[in-house]
Amino acid sequence: MYSKASAPEYQGALGSLSVNSSLEDVLARGTEQLRAARREGSREEMARCGLAVAEAHRRLGQVEEADQAWKASYRDARAAGATGAMAWAVWSGGTLARQRGDLRLAFRLLGLAARLAKEGDDVVARGYSLAGMAETGRIQGDYQAVGELHEQLLAEARKRGEARHTVWALEGIAQMHRNTGEYDKALAMFREAAQIARDADDRRGHAWALRGVADILSVRGDDPQPALDLLSEAEAICREMNLTSALAYNHKMRGNVFFRAGRYEEARGMYEGALGQFRGMSEPRGEALSRLGLVKSLAHLGRDPEQTAADLRALRAELDRIGLRHARDMVDKAQAELGVEPRAQEAASDAKPKHPEMPAEAHAEPVGAMR
């Protein structure tokens, strides 16, 4: 039995906010309470309200404001000597770094957050930090390094009946199964995540899980309409809650469904829209994936092969710079499918992986970390 989803990142005077609170409401109330805490001279309360402000800005795609807010939250927490609040602020900064495509910085910050949380005896912050490190490695494609950590965090979340992190872990493991071709396992886990999220009233987690189910139905070659219907259901949630990043990824996935169904003109339109959304929030991973879909769609619509080849080379270099190994493999696959051979120096560069090493914190035993 799972409890209702909670939002431990909303703390202090904002503790009554829920996981489904609109981001505009979180930002407005967080800003108001931050001013009140500043008037009262409470640095720890300023740090906790600042955390909510930082997270609202980040989830709305306002990355510069989010960057300023998490750093201010950290400074206030440090001034108050509140190590746990310092951990939460750095966790927010690490999550923002991952969103912006700086995976090395994300690893460093999330590792620091985990250490601070341990020092401050904040087991929830430590759990979130370890989960963030696991997600960063998964997004990068380093499944061997983070697969066990995902499984351990899932087991802990199930044991406690903690819905939000059960959903997160299920979706992460499902994505790894999906990317390694184990579609049946992935589909079962995405569907379980969707059901748990629905029952726990975790609307954000539900929207992401529906997107995962739609992806599997589409990639297996099923009728595209059920996948499109699921994406429409998820989109309604994203729009109602103003989940900017989730909405952009929803649109990119709709492009994927159209592309796999051979509906290249519709796919192009969705990829172009998603590309603009990701650029507007400075999210390079989503931007790169949308660019890849757009290049492939245009190629099928008759674009000049030389231009396609040039675009894929540039995209591959960008993905290599960011360190997104799985996405880079997708470019290699596109080059083969479209008859565009990679240059010799590209193949040679594969011998030198450019992804950051997993910090020691990610290999630590997480038992009890999210209790």
Predicted regions: what is each one?
Residues 1-25, 32, 280-371:
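C-terminal non-catalytic interaction modules
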Residues 10-12, 31, 51, 91, ...:
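TPR/TPR-like alpha-solenoid signature
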Residues 20, 38-42, 59, 76-82, ...:
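Short coil/turn linkers that connect adjacent helices within long alpha-helical scaffolds
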Residues 26, 66, 106, 146, ...:
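Single-residue signature of alpha-solenoid repeat helices
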Residues 45, 65, 85, 125, ...:
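Structural signature of alpha-solenoid helical repeat junctions
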Residues 48, 88, 108, 128, ...:
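Residue register of alpha-helical TPR repeats
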